Regions:
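N-terminal intrinsically disordered, cationic/polar leader segments
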Residues: 1-30, 43-108, 114-129
């Protein structure tokens, strides 16, 4: 199964693609091919957006069966729309082939100050119980 985990906030996006779908053997797996096309499109869009200055802080790591990337972007940007389109396509694949891939939205990326604030609020809640 391929697991796709992503975090999205108003200014930052991060995603990881991990594993082989297992729909068919390597080279004949249409689910894995669909996921690979979408991951590749996202990486190409990131490279172009980085060159044009639309995104900043772009990072990408690739290994066999694993891709992780992250970047910062503006609210109304082309990359924001690209991310939403690719996530929608991944969700459609998941709907059809849910036994072979899973798309997981994780908590939005927070700044350190927001994270510390939330930790303090959680601690207050635990103390009140």
């Amino acid at each position: 199964m391929t697991e796709i985990k992503y975090r999205d906030s108003a200014a930052r996006f991060a995603v990881s693609f991990c594993g082989h779908a297992g729909y068919a053997e390597c080279g004949k797996d249409i689910v894995c091919a669909g996921i690979s096309v979408l991951a590749s499109e996202l990486m190409l869009a990131c490279e172009q957006a980085q060159r044009s200055g639309e995104i900043t802080d772009y990072r990408c790591a690739e290994e066999s069966g694993y891709v992780k990337l992250s970047f910062s972007y503006g609210e109304g940007s082309f990359m924001r729309r690209t991310v939403r389109l690719i996530l929608a396509c991944l969700r459609l694949l998941e709907k059809e082939y849910g036994s072979y891939l899973r798309v997981v939205a994780q908590s939005p990326i927070q700044s350190q100050s927001q994270s510390r604030y939330n930790e303090g609020e959680n601690q207050k809640e635990r103390m009140a119980l």
